[in-house]
Amino acid sequence: MTRKQRRLTIIGGALFVLAVAAGLVLNALRDSIVFFSTPTMVAEKHIGPGKRFRLGGLVQPGSLKRGDDLAVTFEVADGGAKLPVAYKGILPDLFREGQGVVAEGALDAAGVFKADTVLAKHDETYMPKEVADTLKKQGHWKDDYGKPQAAKPGPVSMREGEKTAAGATQ
């Protein structure tokens, strides 16, 4: 074997090893790359009990039930499917029915998602992209989804002296 053939063999072998390593890394990260799975995706993937993942969607209105010792159950929906969630702990301040949520945990044998972490949305206009796309595709999308509700104006009355004093301080 000449020097040139040996060099090409070594370079080809190194490229092959790098390609195999990249393939193994991408295969291992395949499920981790997705930030969360929607209930429809969970049903399609047939995720088995005990496998940890993130579940995202909207808290189904009327599904929130509080139990003893901070135990809470609710359903997460994406417009196509619903998944029951059980959580024991303090819920975030922004958590409420009809709002976006991401929970981390695993399914149990009964098909209930046992969450050990629950995150509520931060932005008033937030809706997971997959949920919005699913709602649009199924024809359930409403233009007011994801928009903040305006607060009801209360009675405001200022006397003339207070108006000028308030205007002077601004």
Swiss-Prot record:
Heme binds at H122, Y126. Residues 1-7 are cytoplasmic. One of its GO terms (cellular component) is plasma membrane. GO terms for molecular function: heme binding; metal ion binding. It comes from the Bacteria. Residues 137-146 have a biased composition (Basic and acidic residues). Its main location: membrane. Residues 137-170 are annotated as: Disordered. Keywords: Cell inner membrane, Cell membrane, Cytochrome c-type biogenesis, Heme, Iron, Membrane, Metal-binding, Signal-anchor, Transmembrane, Transmembrane helix. Coiled coil: none annotated. One of its GO terms (biological process) is cytochrome complex assembly. The keyword Heme applies. This is Cytochrome c-type biogenesis protein CcmE. It comes from Bradyrhizobium sp. (strain BTAi1 / ATCC BAA-1182). The gene is ccmE.
